[in-house]
Amino acid sequence: MVAPIPAKRGRKPAVATAPATGQVQSLTRGLKLLEWIAESNGSVALTELAQQAGLPNSTTHRLLTTMQQQGFVRQVGELGHWAIGAHAFMVGSSFLQSRNLLAIVHPILRNLMEESGETVNMAVLDQSDHEAIIIDQVQCTHLMRMSAPIGGKLPMHASGAGKAFLAQLSEEQVTKLLHRKGLHAYTHATLVSPVHLKEDLAQTRKRGYSFDDEEHALGLRCLAACIFDEHREPFAAISISGPISRITDDRVTEFGAMVIKAAKEVTLAYGGMR
């Protein structure tokens, strides 16, 4: 993993090289804030960013919350420091091009595929759209196997990775998300009742893994567990997917234990904490 560049303390406020007005000025300021967060040791306080930018705290906060709404930055930890968001992957591939996470994860995904005999995926959380995005995959060798495109999106309420993420939210956050996004029915098994979904999420927290039982596609089952960063925040999930003929009722617990173990390995290797 590439060592993060420590934040430079006491940096003089930035001085614009050319005059800028309106939205262009706001865009320039926002991009500079994004760069400084990326150069930090993981997260930066609002006051430090404001000092670096030579802006009032209120203006800096407004720029950050705008980028947060689009998923480019996120708040982490009890102090609410600012860190890079996963949506950077969608527009600039910075999340993927660094190769740090994938270099750590891919061997673990391959081992999990060999152990389980099923296709294994890794997805990250896109906080702006509240969807899970597949960024890596190791397909099994069976003729009948699950296949999803890299960059493909998974619904939060009807996928293993999505429900693993949802289970880490508070009930208030889940309620707010469901009110905004709704519960689309993909199959007859999709959980379209908020009450039933919340009951399922409670079971996910208790087990340590989520279980998509033909809720996104008929005949397909998926189990997933979250990966956590250094702030104990979930940012990715590992999943095992396969047909119901192979992921049978008597093997669900076995597959669940496998995916929990793999997720813990990645969390530890990535320097995260649970």
Curated annotation (Swiss-Prot):
GO cellular component, one term: cytosol
SUPFAM superfamilies named among the record's database cross-references: GAF domain-like, Winged helix' DNA-binding domain
Effect of M146D: Strongly reduced promoter binding and tetramerization
DNA-binding region, residue range(s): 46-65
Superkingdom per UniProt: Bacteria
Annotated signal peptide: none
Keywords, ordered alphabetically: DNA-binding, Glyoxylate bypass, Repressor, Transcription, Transcription regulation
One Pfam family of this chain: IclR_C
GO biological process: glyoxylate cycle; negative regulation of DNA-templated transcription; regulation of DNA-templated transcription
InterPro entries noted in UniProt: GAF-like_dom_sf, HTH_MetabolicPath_Reg, Tscrpt_reg_IclR_C, Tscrpt_reg_IclR_N, WH-like_DNA-bd_sf, WH_DNA-bd_sf
Residues annotated as domain HTH iclR-type: 24-86
GO molecular function, one term: DNA binding
Impact noted for substituting L143D: Strongly reduced promoter binding and tetramerization
Domain IclR-ED positions: 101-272
Subunit structure, as described in the record: Homotetramer and homodimer. Homotetramer in its active, DNA-bound form. Homodimer in its inactive form.
Annotated function: Regulation of the glyoxylate bypass operon (aceBAK), which encodes isocitrate lyase, malate synthase as well as isocitrate dehydrogenase kinase/phosphorylase. Glyoxylate disrupts the interaction with the promoter by favoring the inactive dimeric form. Pyruvate enhances promoter binding by stabilizing the tetrameric form.
NCBIfam families: PRK11569.1
Protein's name in the database: Transcriptional repressor IclR
Taxonomic placement: Bacteria, Pseudomonadati, Pseudomonadota, Gammaproteobacteria, Enterobacterales
